[in-house]
Design a protein with these regions (language model features):
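TPR-adjacent "capping" and linker segments in tetratricopeptide-repeat scaffold/adaptor proteins
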Residues: 18-23, 70-87
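"A position-specific structural signal for the A-helix of alpha-solenoid helical repeats
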Residues: 33, 66, 86, 90-94, ...
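Terminal, low-structured helical/coil segments at or just beyond the last alpha-helical repeat
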Residues: 129-152
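Short coil turns that delineate tetratricopeptide repeat
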Residues: 24-25, 58, 116-118
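Canonical positions in the second alpha-helix
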Residues: 20, 52-53, 111
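Residue-level signature for tetratricopeptide repeat
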Residues: 3, 20, 35-37, 94-98, ...
Length: 152
């Protein structure tokens, strides 16, 4: 399941994780991986699954990514906020919720380029969480890791 996750094969990973969790519901590693891969579809449930996990180590980093993305997916920028950064963040949230991770990366990067301090600098955390979400060895992670490093 982890190998599928790392390479961005979400469906295959979720199928394996579901079977693992049916047999062993206390498997924290599988639970965190499952939460990470389902946070776009069910942010509140995903956040609940990782609620008691400290942000330390590999599992902790994934749990923190779930918390960041859960909050991000529920973000609603005030419609009176007309800044370019706000428009990009809103587009990124909509893309993420729709499963369009590449578009979410693009819009988040643009929001960061326009205003590095928008949302009190949380865009950095969102970009890092999107990298973790996409799978560390996936094509998307490779592509956007380089671009993110160039704008930071």
């Amino acid at each position: 399941a982890e190998n599928f996750y790392r390479t961005g094969q979400r469906e295959e990973s979720l199928q394996k994780l579901s079977r693992i969790l049916e047999r062993n519901p206390d498997n924290r590693r599988a639970e965190v991986l499952y939460a990470l891969q389902t946070v776009a579809q069910n942010p509140a449930k995903a956040k609940e699954l990782v609620n008691n996990i400290e942000p330390v180590g590999f599992i902790g980093e994934m749990a923190e990514a779930v918390r960041v993305l859960s909050q991000f997916s529920q973000t609603r920028i005030n419609s009176e906020e007309k800044s370019e950064a706000a428009q990009h963040v809103n587009a990124s949230v909509m893309a993420f919720r729709s499963g369009l991770v590449e578009k979410a990366f693009q819009e988040s990067i643009e929001a960061f380029r326009v205003d590095k301090d928008f949302m009190d600098g949380k865009i950095r955390q969102i970009l890092a969480a999107l990298l973790i979400y996409s799978g560390e060895e996936s094509r998307l992670a490779e592509k956007y890791r380089k671009e993110i490093l160039s704008v930071l």
